[in-house]
Amino acid sequence: IQRNLLVVFGSVQRVMRVERAARDRGLDVDAVPAPRSVSSECGVVLEIGSADADALTDVLDILKIEPTAVYRKKGETWTPSTLETATVDQLVKLTEGSAYGGCGAKLSKGLLHTVLCGLPRLASDDLIVGIESADDAGVVRLTDELALIHTTDFSPPLVDDPYPFGRIAAANALSDVWAMGGTPLAAKNLVSYPLKQLGKEALKEVLRGGLETMAESGAVLAGGHTVEGQELLYGLAVTGTVHPDKVWRNGGALPGDALVLTKPLGTGLVTTAAKGGMAEADHVTTAMRWMTTLNRDAAVILVEVDPHAVTDVTGFGLAGHAAEMAEASGCAVELELEALPALSL
C-alpha cells in the first residue's frame, strides 16, 4: 500500500506512541523525517497510506491523541488534508473548472471606480468606515464602546483540493477583520457550487476546511447561503467587533513610517504556476502552508505598537494595496525590492 499521508504531532514521543499502537493493529506506518516544506514542531512525522486512514483514526481515538496537521501527497506535492478527506481529495481537481484562481478573479480597480462613480452613497453618522477609501471592511458604530465590522470575501479555487481551498478562502475572509483592528465574531458561508461536475462530497470538504479555520479564529458559524452555479465559488461573510476609537484604516500612514508585512510575498505566483503545471512540489506546499496561516497572532502584536495604517494584502498585490494606502494617507510609498520578504523556496 502506498504511504501517501503524513500525520504531524507535537512531539517525537507522540509519534512513537502512535506508531507502536498502529503497528500493533497491523497498520503499515513509519516514523520519518518531516519534509522541508511540511511544518513540524519535532521534525518527525508519521507516514501512512490513505487506505488505513480510518483505522488510524480509531487508534488515535483510543490514545486520545489528535494530530496537529495532516498532509496528503498529490504528485510530488504535500498538500494540507485531514484523515477524513484523504480519499475525497484524490477524486477532484477544483481548478479545472475555473477561469481564474483566488483573488485573481477580482474586477479591476479602474472598472470598479467607473461603475461606482455617480451612484448615491447611503451615509450615516454611525458609519465609521464606508467605501470611500477602498478599505478592507465596513465599520458601523453601535454604541460609544462597540462597533461592528462587516466584510465579505469569496473567490474561485486557487488550489485543486477541496479541504485546503476551504481553509484558504476562510482565512482570506477573516483576515479583513484583523486588518481593521477587530476580533471575528461570526461568519456565514457563501457558496456557488457546480454539483454535477464535482459531486456533494467535495462540497462537504470545502466547508469542513472553512469550518476548521473559523474554529481556529474563535468565530462561530451563523449560517450561510448556497446556489448551484457553473463555477465553484466559496468564501465568508464575516462580522467582527472593535472599539469605535480603535479602528485601523488603510489611511493614516506618515512620512518615515516603516512598511511591515506579516507574511512573505509570492503565493499568487506559485499558485498561478501550479495551475499551469509549472510549479515545484515543495513550493506549492510552502505556499499553501502560508495561505492557511491566520493573521490573528500578527494582529495581537500590532495592537501593542499602535500602527498608523493597516491593510490586508490580497488580490491587488503589494503594489496595488500600497498604492491604496498611499492615496488614502496623502503620501508616497517607497519600496526597496531587496528588503521585501519572499517565500523561502
Regions found by a protein language model. Give the residues of each.
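Helix-biased detector of long, well-ordered alpha-helical tracts
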Residues: A86-L345
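Positively charged, small/polar-rich N-terminal and surface patches that mediate targeting and assembly
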Residues: I1-V88
